């Protein structure tokens, strides 16, 4: 089976050098995902030759950087002969348009002795006897002919890809991954922008927490463009014991700050250039603007919050689409360690608590469990 793959539109807008780099990364990601067949680039698209099965279609639909793709039939060389194209179109499309209202869409790259309109008209005339009629505005079925120099491609399906950028073109980001509904969606959104996530999980729920985090990451792995996901699991219980020394109402913000500090160390270790969280403005007490300011104060890496303007319904909708919702919904809210958390914590208080607690963030990270998925 031959598949034509159309990269995301924004890739085409890059400089020639960047475009080559992005298309090269996309091709490598596809190779990693499909693991068989042959792939090559040509005039702004990619071609993939694989065994004829639906598994490849499903896998391609989760590769970031792909706008759409189509399984195609082709004439290798037709010597600029429109009659050859018409005959092949009848062979490929006669059953597809049978008893249906149809339209023909054609486009060309290269020099030919006919126009795209000629192709549409002549092929339409040839297919008309098999059909129930033609309607260019609202057809029941569309058939496509794409002529690239001396090769013509025939297809009737355009399968949507996830768009975005190929995973790997934007470097690494450390993701604070609780395993709730939000953090897997934030991870997915950063992968969509080309970033490789390094996962940092504070385990506050033992084996159950660990189990569901691993299941969520196995789902996200299908969207990673073949890149392995590295997971660092920190023993969060030890951190909670430390936090019991400070005022209850400050503990949630302080816990988040500890997470940021450990993430900062992991950025150093993993050569990541940012920290990503699933925080959404004012969704919970620790995510008010004041508390977010306090939480990230003094952190040297930029903090990305891809969900900052999303409401919960929008996040849930994305989680369902990604496939992580069914696992996230089973997890308790482990970070809710105080019933009377403050919506406006004073920075001076938190910095004083931090000094008194004197947590060794390097040691916390060193004692983490590392899993590659």
Curated annotation (Swiss-Prot):
Pathway entry: Cofactor biosynthesis; thiamine diphosphate biosynthesis
Top-level taxon in the UniProt lineage: Archaea
Domain THUMP residue range list: 54-158
Annotated GO biological process: thiamine biosynthetic process; thiamine diphosphate biosynthetic process; thiazole biosynthetic process; tRNA 4-thiouridine biosynthesis
Keyword rRNA processing applies: no
Gene Ontology terms: cellular component: cytosol
Its EC number(s): 2.8.1.4
Record's catalysed reaction(s): [ThiI sulfur-carrier protein]-S-sulfanyl-L-cysteine + a uridine in tRNA + 2 reduced [2Fe-2S]-[ferredoxin] + ATP + H(+) = [ThiI sulfur-carrier protein]-L-cysteine + a 4-thiouridine in tRNA + 2 oxidized [2Fe-2S]-[ferredoxin] + AMP + diphosphate; [ThiS sulfur-carrier protein]-C-terminal Gly-Gly-AMP + S-sulfanyl-L-cysteinyl-[cysteine desulfurase] + AH2 = [ThiS sulfur-carrier protein]-C-terminal-Gly-aminoethanethioate + L-cysteinyl-[cysteine desulfurase] + A + AMP + 2 H(+)
InterPro entries attached to this UniProt entry: Rossmann-like_a/b/a_fold, ThiI_AANH, ThiI_fer, ThiI_N, THUMP_dom, THUMP_ThiI, tRNA_STrfase, tRNA_sulfurtransferase_ThiI
PROSITE patterns noted in UniProt: THUMP
Main location class: cytoplasm
Keyword ATP-binding among record annotations: yes
Protein purpose: Catalyzes the ATP-dependent transfer of a sulfur to tRNA to produce 4-thiouridine in position 8 of tRNAs, which functions as a near-UV photosensor. Also catalyzes the transfer of sulfur to the sulfur carrier protein ThiS, forming ThiS-thiocarboxylate. This is a step in the synthesis of thiazole, in the thiamine biosynthesis pathway. The sulfur is donated as persulfide by IscS.
Family, similarity comment: Belongs to the ThiI family.
Name the record gives this protein: Probable tRNA sulfurtransferase
Gene: thiI
């Amino acid at each position: 089976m031959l598949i034509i793959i159309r990269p995301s539109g924004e890739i085409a807008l890059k400089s020639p050098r960047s475009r080559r780099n992005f298309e090269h990364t996309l091709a490598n990601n596809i190779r990693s995902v499909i693991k068989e067949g042959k792939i090559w680039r040509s005039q702004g698209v990619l071609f993939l030759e694989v065994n004829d099965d639906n598994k490849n279609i499903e896998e391609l639909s989760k590769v970031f950087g792909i706008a759409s793709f189509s399984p195609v039939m082709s004439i290798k060389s037709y010597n600029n002969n429109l009659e050859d194209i018409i005959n092949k179109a009848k062979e490929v499309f006669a059953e597809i348009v049978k008893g249906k209202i149809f339209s023909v869409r054609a486009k060309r790259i290269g020099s030919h002795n006919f126009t795209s309109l000629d192709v549409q008209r002549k092929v339409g005339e040839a297919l008309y006897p098999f059909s129930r009629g033609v309607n260019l505005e609202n057809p029941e079925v569309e058939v496509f002919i794409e002529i690239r120099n001396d090769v013509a491609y025939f297809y009737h399906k355009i399968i949507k890809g996830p768009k975005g950028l190929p995973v790997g073109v934007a470097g690494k980001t450390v993701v604070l991954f609780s395993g709730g509904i939000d953090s897997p969606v934030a991870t997915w959104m950063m992968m969509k922008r080309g970033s490789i996530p390094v996962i940092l999980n504070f385990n506050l729920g033992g084996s159950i927490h660990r189990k569901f985090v691993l299941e969520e990451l196995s789902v996200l792995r299908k969207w990673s463009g073949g890149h392995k996901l590295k997971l660092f699991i920190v023993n969060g219980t030890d951190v909670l014991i430390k936090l019991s020394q400070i005022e209850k109402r400050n503990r949630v913000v302080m816990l988040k700050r500890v997470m940021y500090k450990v993430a900062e160390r992991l950025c150093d270790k993993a050569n990541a250039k940012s920290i990503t969280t699933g925080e959404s403005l004012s969704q919970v007490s620790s995510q008010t603007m004041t508390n977010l300011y306090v939480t990230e104060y003094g952190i040297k890496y930029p903090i990305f919050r891809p969900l900052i303007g999303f409401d919960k319904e929008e996040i849930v909708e994305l989680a369902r689409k990604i496939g992580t919702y069914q696992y996230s919904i089973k997890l308790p809210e482990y970070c809710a360690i105080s019933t009377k958390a403050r919506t406006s914590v004073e920075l001076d208080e938190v910095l004083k608590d931090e000094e008194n607690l004197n947590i060794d963030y390097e040691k916390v990270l060193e004692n983490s469990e590392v899993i590659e998925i």
